[in-house]
Amino acid sequence: MTRIALLDYGMGNLHSAAKALEHVGATVDVTNDPKLIAKADKIVFPGVGAMRDCMQGMHEAGIDEVVRQAVFNKPVLAICVGMQALLESSEENGGVPALGIFEGAVKHFPDLGHLKVPHMGWNQVYQNDPAHPMWNNIDQDSRFYFVHSYYVEPKQSDLIAATCDYGLQFCTAIHKDNLFATQFHPEKSHTAGLQLLKNFVEWNI
């Protein structure tokens, strides 16, 4: 059975993510222990809330370097602020440095007129590469659940695995080698979200 380290650095409710991963067949360790993370087959890097708190929580838990190393040697799924933290910086709070694994920045939604920010609720996701194993058995334009005021803007367009429209078209998933990341919350996205988590559990790289 696939053993997944679900990173716990004080950001958000990990219960729903842990239960969803267990539901699709994973053994889950909710942990910030570098030794357990190193032993895991795969890593899920969640995150909700503010980027500054996210970066501070990782640093205080001593797992920022663990994450930097993990993305090069085992399958990683980053979710919401976890995905945003992979880029170089965020506009939040006047500018917050992030992990810098990928070139690019995290931008705040502009004034979208009649559309409210944060972007909260269900929205369609367009898969740039439906053949990617993480999209197995997920229909094009399936709906996923979002809660965010910021979105990622990677410098390399070939990192973009999916997009979404909310007043503007924005990147909602990125991928490179053994890493996949989503702005939406698969653990809150019912059938399509559970399928994506199942695909991650079964993803052989």
Curated annotation (Swiss-Prot):
Give this protein's Gene Ontology molecular function annotations: glutaminase activity; imidazoleglycerol-phosphate synthase activity; lyase activity
Q: Does the keyword Mitochondrion apply?
A: no
Give the EC number: 4.3.2.10, 3.5.1.2
Q: Which InterPro entries match?
A: Class_I_gatase-like, GATASE, Imidazole-glycPsynth_HisH
Annotated function:
IGPS catalyzes the conversion of PRFAR and glutamine to IGP, AICAR and glutamate. The HisH subunit catalyzes the hydrolysis of glutamine to glutamate and ammonia as part of the synthesis of IGP and AICAR. The resulting ammonia molecule is channeled to the active site of HisF.
Q: Which NCBIfam families match?
A: IMP_synth_hisH
Q: What is this protein called?
A: Imidazole glycerol phosphate synthase subunit HisH
User: Which gene underlies this protein?
Assistant: hisH
